[in-house]
Amino acid sequence: MSLLKVDNLMFNYSDKELFNGISFQLNQGEHAVLVGQNGSGKTTIFDLITKKLTPDKGTIEWTPGVTYSYLDQHYKVNDDFTVIEFLEQIYKNLFDKEKHMNELYEKGSNPDDPNYFKYLDQASLINDELLRDDFYSIKEKIDKVIVGLGIPKEYKERKLNILSSGQREKIYLAKMLLEEHDVLLLDEPTNYLDAPHVKWLAEYLQNYPKAFLVISHDEPFLSQIANVVLHLQ
């Protein structure tokens, strides 16, 4: 199934023709990389398909309902969050369910309450939902990703604003990986990674069950993760 279709895309930048009739599509499960010389417009393609820029001609169509995570090189967030607060935002609806479940268990702590069994039954149903959504492995999942990208687990309680720019970029990348949207759009994801963490990311993306489109100057990295190569002339 096609997730994204780009057809006959034309775009001029500062009176210079950048694209003249580019067409491609990204299908479900494809691991695609976008390659081309410096200045060929790879990042501009991302700005166009994420609607930061508008093409002069042509069409860009996302299949209705498809979601994507976009990691660009200028990602900004409220850096007053701690690392764990920032990453747990991804699962806010599940943590809200857990809070409600605990409130029900507290209400159901008195066997003499006429609603005792009602509270416990409702709490049990919520717990079943949390189990189905793998809620109880979230903290382990977060640890695996941040450590894989080179962030020690003890940094989870640190605020983003005291981390280095490279460490923040790793946390932003971790968020994209954990969100598990239909499509990952990654622009230079290895910029701040040491060799062992580039290796970890390559293995993670090799096994990624959904689609992605990646830009990188790291050719060995691209060759490890790609099953589709899109060339910008």
Where is each model-derived feature located?
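ABC ATP-binding cassette signature C-motif
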Residues: 1-233
